[in-house]
Amino acid sequence: MSFTGVRSLDQSIDKTNAWLAEIAGEFGTGDRQFAYRVTRAWLHALRDRLPVQVAANFAAQLPELLRGVFYGGWNPSKVPAKFGPSEYALRFARDAGVRETEVARAAGLVTRVVRRHVSDGALDEALDVLPLDLSQLIEPAGEAIGRPARADQM
């Protein structure tokens, strides 16, 4: 079905819908609005912690519609913001509409779906520039099967 009559936009809508359906499924819900909120919170919290070039490399892997969400409200002159896991949890919980105690699980589930759809290199590059404790909040140990250990993990 064509939503816009523009093939590339329709494909982006289809891909975004597929991502949101997968994310909703990871949470055991059909609520796409919830899936959108947690995805947006995940994208923005990660984006604000990344250097400009790393953010751009990661965003290039996203469907066009989600790339727009990623960049929405972004101020590249103010990144990377320096915050750790507790500030990440506050931001994510506020924007996703979840409790802080749910952030690790929620972020991990979104990361699992994102990892299925973007190149390992782009996601690994983004996670590797973060402090280890923050990276492990976003992608809990054991989730990134086959991902090489970071030097600060050895």
PLM region spans:
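Short, solvent-exposed interaction modules
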Residues: 66-120
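Alpha-helical membrane-protein topology signature
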Residues: 4, 8-11, 27, 92-95, ...
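Preference for long, well-ordered alpha-helical segments
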Residues: 110-154
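The feature marks the first
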Residues: 4-49
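Amphipathic, non-membrane alpha-helical segments in soluble helical-bundle scaffolds
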Residues: 5-13, 32, 36, 52-56, ...
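Amphipathic alpha-helical interaction segments
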Residues: 37-41, 57-64, 87, 105, ...
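Acidic (E/D-rich), amphipathic helical modules within compact regulatory domains
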Residues: 34-77
